[in-house]
Amino acid sequence: MDTLKFKLVIAYDGTAYQGWQVQKIGTGVQEKIEAAFGRMFPGVKRIHSSSRTDTGVHALGMVAHVEIPRAEFKMPDARLALALNAFLPDDIRVLSAVRAPKKFHARFDATGKQYRYYVWNHHAMNPLLQKRAWHFPVKLDLAKMRAAAKLFIGKHDFRSFAGTRSYEMASNVRTLTRCDLKKSGEQLTFIIEGDGFLYKMCRGIVGTLVQVGQGKIPLAKVADILASRDRRVAGMTAPAHGLVLWKVFYQRSQKSEARSQKRPHTGGSA
């Protein structure tokens, strides 16, 4: 079948969804998008994503690709995203849809991803961020947290910070190129960037860093926890609702990609 391939950038509020994937129980974001495509293009059966976000996790830069039968595509390319959004719920939006090379694959061509995690560090929660940030009311030592964050940069086995799932690859080794902590008012933003991530890895890292800031995990022990490859000795898993898949990187350099696309504001500067 002669098809046209499109690269999609998708944003969604993950609160109401059981993650990205189509689910046997509950609803995945993928299911809603495929249903929208099905109403417009009966020949489209599936979209392929760059990532699989977990239940309650959000996205501003999920990338996917889709192949549309050429015979069914009767609109200007620029109208595709608008047309899809007309069939999507308000908590899912296609930000862009552009033609992609025939060989492009959203997952296998990705060179890295950036996640951001938001914490509201004040005794009173900001009600506007209730579903977007983890409320942690205890005072935190940011200097120790930043020092600990630097220890994650580089190539490591991240087994100590990840959950387990049957689809995980045999290797737990990943390379992080960035692990920063920014502060804007009462909001803390963790920026974690790397070539790939294990299941719940970002949330395990953030939970551990918060416990370092709280004084429950000594800074001196973080390197030992990383080397232990034992989830039981690391910190807690941060809640899902503070995590956002911010960006997926492809062939161009990560810095130029990040500069070329501005993201919607999410309650504070990163």
Map each language-model feature to its residues:
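Structured-RNA-binding interfaces characteristic of tRNA pseudouridine synthases
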Residues: M1-K255, R263-A270
